[in-house]
Amino acid sequence: MTQEMPFDVTRARRAGARLAAVQALYEMEQTEKSARATIREFMEDRLGLGPDGTPVEDADPDLFKSIVNSVVEHQAKIDTAILARLAEGWKLTRLDATMRALLRAGAAEFIAHQELSDAIILSEYVSLAHDFFDEGDAKFANAVLQNMGRDLRA
């Protein structure tokens, strides 16, 4: 007999997976490590650790892997969608590397996790944006993700 996890435990595990995915994507960009190597490293040593290295709620490993792999699989489409929301003449490299990772992860969930509502994905990534950035940058992430979500799911 399987026992269902309470909603808030499941929600916390999914939030942990999203945080880990943003961290992994950031690391992949900075070190040029492959998705496979980065996922393996996180699964063995770092999944479930916060930005400062302290333990947080166990992260959902399946969601973590899905987000990272979806970014890799759909990166051209995702980056095109992000670029379409930037000011004319801006390049992706003008964005902070953590912001790029966060926007890519959110976009990947819009593509790969049709079972989740736009509102849930948006709320989770805006919450993460508040963890990393000031209010202005969190509002920027909100606007970009909200517009991308509509287009990526259309």
From Swiss-Prot:
Name of the coding gene: nusB
Alphabetical list of InterPro entries matching this protein: NusB-like_sf, NusB_fam, NusB_RsmB_TIM44
Entry superkingdom: Bacteria
UniProt GO MF annotations: RNA binding
Record-stated family: Belongs to the NusB family.
Signal peptide coordinates: none
Keywords, ordered alphabetically: RNA-binding, Transcription, Transcription antitermination, Transcription regulation
UniProt-recorded name of the protein: Transcription antitermination protein NusB
Native species: Hyphomonas neptunium (strain ATCC 15444)
NCBIfam families linked to this entry: nusB (TIGR01951)
GO biological process, one term: DNA-templated transcription termination
